[in-house]
A protein has these predicted regions:
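Long, contiguous interaction/targeting segments characteristic
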Residues: 1-25
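Extracellular/luminal regions of secreted and cell-surface proteins that mediate adhesion/ECM remodeling
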Residues: 18-159
Length: 159
C-alpha cells in the first residue's frame, strides 16, 4: 500500500504524531518536595511531595494486574556508592490518580530509628514492590538519576 494509514500519519498529520510523542502516555515527576535535611536517628520524619503528570495518559495502576504494584518511595542512598541503604515506600499515593494538570499532594511519615548516623542523600523513585522495591517506572527527568534509577534530591545528615 503506497498511501496507507502510516503514510498519512507522517505526511498529513505529522504535527499530531509529534505532539503524541512529546506529550502522550504518562510522565510522572515530583514538582514540589518538603524534605528534612538534619535528623536525629530516633526521630520520625515527614516528607510531603507533590506529584505531577506531564502526559495526557495515566499510569494504569488501577488495573487488577498492576494494583498496588508500583508505589512512590523515598530512599537514603549511601553518599559514595549512591546505592540505597534504606527505602521507605509510601502506600498512600495511587499513581493512576496523577492526571495532567492535576497535581497531587501526599505525605509520608516514617520512623528512621534504624538509620545509622552519617551523611546520606535523599532520593525518590517509583518502585515495583513485586521486585524487592527496585525501581519499576522511571521518573520523567533527565538529570540527577542514579544508575539504579533513583532521582537524587538533596543531602541529609542523620545524627
Amino acid at each position: 500500500i503506497v498511501y496507507g494509514e502510516t503514510y498519512s500519519w507522517f505526511n498529513d498529520a505529522f504535527t499530531l504524531v509529534a505532539e503524541l510523542i512529546a506529550e502522550g502516555s504518562y510522565r510522572l515527576y515530583p514538582d514540589r518536595l518538603s524534605l528534612p535535611q538534619n535528623n536525629s536517628n530516633a526521630s520520625t520524619i515527614t516528607i510531603t511531595p507533590r506529584w505531577c503528570n506531564l502526559g495526557w495518559g495515566y499510569c494504569p495502576t488501577n488495573k487488577p494486574q498492576w494494583k498496588d504494584r508500583y508505589k512512590i518511595a523515598f530512599a537514603l542512598p549511601d553518599k559514595n556508592t549512591l546505592l540505597p541503604t534504606h527505602v521507605y515506600v509510601n502506600q498512600e499515593p495511587e499513581l493512576s490518580d496523577c492526571l495532567q494538570s492535576r497535581p497531587r499532594n501526599y505525605r509520608l511519615t516514617q520512623n528512621i530509628s534504624n538509620v545509622a548516623s552519617g551523611d546520606y542523600i535523599w532520593a525518590v523513585g517509583i518502585v515495583d514492590n513485586s521486585n524487592n522495591n527496585e525501581i519499576g517506572i522511571q521518573i520523567s527527568t533527565r538529570e540527577d538519576i542514579t544508575s539504579e534509577g533513583w532521582l537524587t534530591l538533596c543531602d541529609v545528615t542523620v545524627q
